[in-house]
Amino acid sequence: GPHAPDATYVDHGYDERLFDTGEVQLNHVVVGDADRPALLLVPGQTESWWGYEAALPPLAEHFQCFAVDLRGQGRSTRTPGRYTLDNLGNDLVRFVDGVIGRPTIVSGLSSGGVLSAWLSAYAKRGQIVAAHYEDPPLFASEVNTSTGPSLRHSIGPVFALMSKYRGDQWSVGDWDGMLAAAP
């Protein structure tokens, strides 16, 4: 995030900008002409706008693209313990208001697809005109799934170990302690 040394990041060929939501700074890039429809690209968990880098040139032929790092990702502000759908979604509502400023198409990958669905339901009236959800894990964390184990049952214990021993995203933490605690 903004507190990380620039040496951590490599140049990606687009001018990265920061938008202050009032709580966090969201890193993002804007590619394409402003007279084209607005397209907000939302990456998956632990990803960055960089995942959209190869897709930006062809998309920019038809859209003005806004690719964003969510809080805790890329150069955006870290907020340990505050990564909820409502917090992430409201960051994006503020981003659409403060940066895009017009009706927007939203497309999200994986957990970014879940956020796209969240925006479809909870964004301000008129902000989102269309939404695309690419491989969203909408039912992956059901407590009692109809068939087979849920994400919470299978990988949930690993996430708990990572949270306890590794710390927040991007920190080094206690790798040896985590390995010793693993079943």
Identify the role of each PLM range:
Residues V24-R78:
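Conserved HGGG/HGGXW glycine-rich cap/lid loop of the alpha/beta-hydrolase fold
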Residues E47, G72, G113, L138-F139:
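Active-site micro-motifs of SAM-dependent methyltransferase domains
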Residues W118-A121, Q127-D168:
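Flexible "cap/lid" loop of the alpha/beta hydrolase fold
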Residues G44, D91, E134-D135:
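Conserved acidic functional residues
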Residues F19-G22, V29, P57, A67-S107, ...:
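Active-site loop/oxyanion-hole signature of alpha/beta-hydrolase fold enzymes
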Residues W50, R94, P136-L138:
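Hydrophobic side chains within alpha-helical segments
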Residues G1-L39, A60-F63, I100-P103, I128-V129:
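Alpha/beta-hydrolase fold catalytic core
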